[in-house]
Amino acid sequence: METLETRRLKLRQWSESDFINFARYYADEDNARYVGGKKDPDQAWRHMALQIGHWNLKGFGYWAVDHRDTNEFIGCAGLWQSPGWPELELGYWLVTEHQGKGYALEACVACIGYAREVLHAKSLVSYIDPRNAPSIRLAKRLGAAHEGSIELATYGSHCVFRHY
Protein backbone atom coordinates (compact mmCIF):
# COMPACT_ATOMS: atom_id res chain seq x y z
CA MET A 1 0.00 0.00 0.00
CA GLU A 2 1.40 3.32 -1.08
CA THR A 3 1.39 6.24 1.39
CA LEU A 4 -0.04 9.49 0.02
CA GLU A 5 0.83 12.90 1.45
CA THR A 6 -0.88 16.23 1.00
CA ARG A 7 -0.11 19.62 2.50
CA ARG A 8 -1.80 18.74 5.81
CA LEU A 9 -2.54 15.02 5.64
CA LYS A 10 -0.93 11.63 5.42
CA LEU A 11 -2.96 8.76 3.94
CA ARG A 12 -1.35 5.56 5.17
CA GLN A 13 -1.72 1.87 5.88
CA TRP A 14 -3.99 0.94 8.78
CA SER A 15 -2.59 -0.02 12.19
CA GLU A 16 -4.13 -1.63 15.24
CA SER A 17 -3.78 1.66 17.13
CA ASP A 18 -6.38 3.19 14.77
CA PHE A 19 -9.07 0.99 16.24
CA ILE A 20 -9.85 3.20 19.25
CA ASN A 21 -10.88 6.16 17.08
CA PHE A 22 -12.40 3.91 14.42
CA ALA A 23 -14.66 2.25 17.02
CA ARG A 24 -15.50 5.59 18.63
CA TYR A 25 -16.63 6.95 15.26
CA TYR A 26 -18.87 3.96 14.56
CA ALA A 27 -20.31 3.97 18.11
CA ASP A 28 -21.98 7.33 17.36
CA GLU A 29 -25.20 6.97 15.37
CA ASP A 30 -24.93 10.53 14.03
CA ASN A 31 -21.50 9.77 12.56
CA ALA A 32 -22.26 6.31 11.26
CA ARG A 33 -25.70 6.86 9.72
CA TYR A 34 -24.28 7.37 6.22
CA VAL A 35 -21.57 4.69 6.36
CA GLY A 36 -23.45 1.54 7.24
CA GLY A 37 -24.81 2.50 10.65
CA LYS A 38 -23.76 2.28 14.26
CA LYS A 39 -21.50 -0.63 15.23
CA ASP A 40 -20.56 -2.19 18.55
CA PRO A 41 -16.81 -2.71 19.18
CA ASP A 42 -16.79 -6.24 17.72
CA GLN A 43 -18.60 -5.08 14.58
CA ALA A 44 -16.26 -2.08 14.29
CA TRP A 45 -13.23 -4.38 14.55
CA ARG A 46 -14.58 -6.56 11.76
CA HIS A 47 -15.33 -3.49 9.64
CA MET A 48 -11.80 -2.14 10.10
CA ALA A 49 -10.44 -5.57 9.09
CA LEU A 50 -12.69 -5.39 6.02
CA GLN A 51 -11.07 -2.07 5.06
CA ILE A 52 -7.63 -3.66 5.34
CA GLY A 53 -8.64 -6.81 3.47
CA HIS A 54 -10.02 -4.86 0.50
CA TRP A 55 -6.44 -3.86 -0.32
CA ASN A 56 -5.42 -7.52 -0.56
CA LEU A 57 -8.41 -8.50 -2.67
CA LYS A 58 -8.56 -5.55 -5.06
CA GLY A 59 -5.19 -3.79 -4.86
CA PHE A 60 -6.81 -0.58 -3.59
CA GLY A 61 -9.00 0.52 -0.71
CA TYR A 62 -9.33 3.06 2.06
CA TRP A 63 -6.34 4.65 3.72
CA ALA A 64 -6.20 5.70 7.35
CA VAL A 65 -5.86 9.50 7.37
CA ASP A 66 -3.59 11.29 9.83
CA HIS A 67 -3.01 14.99 10.36
CA ARG A 68 0.65 15.49 9.36
CA ASP A 69 1.49 17.96 12.14
CA THR A 70 0.15 15.83 15.00
CA ASN A 71 0.12 12.29 13.53
CA GLU A 72 -3.42 12.07 14.91
CA PHE A 73 -5.82 9.68 13.18
CA ILE A 74 -8.65 11.84 11.82
CA GLY A 75 -10.56 9.45 9.56
CA CYS A 76 -10.26 7.51 6.35
CA ALA A 77 -10.59 8.06 2.62
CA GLY A 78 -10.13 5.90 -0.40
CA LEU A 79 -11.47 3.75 -3.16
CA TRP A 80 -13.92 0.87 -2.96
CA GLN A 81 -15.68 -1.59 -5.22
CA SER A 82 -18.01 -4.16 -3.69
CA PRO A 83 -19.03 -7.21 -5.73
CA GLY A 84 -21.84 -6.20 -8.03
CA TRP A 85 -21.01 -2.50 -7.90
CA PRO A 86 -20.56 -1.29 -11.47
CA GLU A 87 -17.75 1.18 -10.81
CA LEU A 88 -14.95 2.24 -8.52
CA GLU A 89 -16.24 4.45 -5.70
CA LEU A 90 -14.51 7.32 -3.90
CA GLY A 91 -15.49 7.64 -0.25
CA TYR A 92 -14.38 9.06 3.09
CA TRP A 93 -15.33 9.86 6.67
CA LEU A 94 -13.74 12.06 9.31
CA VAL A 95 -14.05 12.08 13.09
CA THR A 96 -16.39 14.84 14.22
CA GLU A 97 -13.82 17.29 15.55
CA HIS A 98 -12.01 17.31 12.18
CA GLN A 99 -15.04 17.89 9.95
CA GLY A 100 -15.54 21.24 8.23
CA LYS A 101 -11.83 22.06 7.94
CA GLY A 102 -11.26 21.07 4.31
CA TYR A 103 -9.52 17.81 5.18
CA ALA A 104 -12.05 15.66 3.30
CA LEU A 105 -11.52 17.72 0.15
CA GLU A 106 -7.75 17.41 0.49
CA ALA A 107 -7.88 13.64 1.09
CA CYS A 108 -10.33 13.05 -1.76
CA VAL A 109 -8.19 15.02 -4.23
CA ALA A 110 -5.27 12.72 -3.33
CA CYS A 111 -7.45 9.63 -3.79
CA ILE A 112 -8.72 10.83 -7.17
CA GLY A 113 -5.12 11.40 -8.27
CA TYR A 114 -4.21 7.87 -7.19
CA ALA A 115 -7.21 6.40 -9.02
CA ARG A 116 -6.31 8.19 -12.23
CA GLU A 117 -2.50 8.01 -12.17
CA VAL A 118 -1.82 4.65 -10.50
CA LEU A 119 -4.95 2.58 -11.16
CA HIS A 120 -5.65 4.24 -14.53
CA ALA A 121 -9.34 4.34 -13.58
CA LYS A 122 -11.51 5.36 -16.50
CA SER A 123 -14.54 5.83 -14.28
CA LEU A 124 -14.92 7.05 -10.70
CA VAL A 125 -18.11 7.75 -8.78
CA SER A 126 -19.30 8.57 -5.28
CA TYR A 127 -22.47 6.90 -4.03
CA ILE A 128 -24.00 9.34 -1.54
CA ASP A 129 -27.06 9.02 0.66
CA PRO A 130 -29.43 11.76 -0.56
CA ARG A 131 -29.76 13.08 3.02
CA ASN A 132 -25.98 13.58 3.35
CA ALA A 133 -25.80 17.25 2.36
CA PRO A 134 -22.12 17.77 3.38
CA SER A 135 -20.95 14.90 1.15
CA ILE A 136 -23.08 16.14 -1.75
CA ARG A 137 -21.49 19.59 -1.38
CA LEU A 138 -18.02 18.00 -1.30
CA ALA A 139 -18.71 15.95 -4.43
CA LYS A 140 -19.73 19.13 -6.23
CA ARG A 141 -16.60 20.95 -4.99
CA LEU A 142 -14.58 18.07 -6.43
CA GLY A 143 -16.24 18.70 -9.80
CA ALA A 144 -18.51 15.65 -9.73
CA ALA A 145 -21.83 15.76 -11.55
CA HIS A 146 -25.05 14.19 -10.26
CA GLU A 147 -26.11 11.38 -12.62
CA GLY A 148 -29.17 9.89 -10.98
CA SER A 149 -29.42 7.16 -8.38
CA ILE A 150 -28.50 3.54 -7.70
CA GLU A 151 -29.95 0.95 -5.34
CA LEU A 152 -27.13 -0.50 -3.24
CA ALA A 153 -27.63 -3.76 -1.37
CA THR A 154 -27.83 -3.08 2.40
CA TYR A 155 -27.44 0.69 1.84
CA GLY A 156 -30.58 1.52 -0.15
CA SER A 157 -30.98 4.27 -2.72
CA HIS A 158 -27.97 6.55 -3.21
CA CYS A 159 -27.22 9.48 -5.50
CA VAL A 160 -24.54 8.80 -8.09
CA PHE A 161 -21.96 11.57 -8.51
CA ARG A 162 -19.48 11.09 -11.36
CA HIS A 163 -15.97 12.50 -10.98
CA TYR A 164 -14.56 13.81 -14.27
Enumerate the language-model features and the residues they cover.
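Acyl-donor (CoA/ACP) binding surface of acyl/acetyltransferases
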Residues: M1-Y34, A49-G53, A64-Y164
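Active-site rim helix/loop that mediates acceptor-substrate recognition in acyltransferases
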Residues: P41-G59
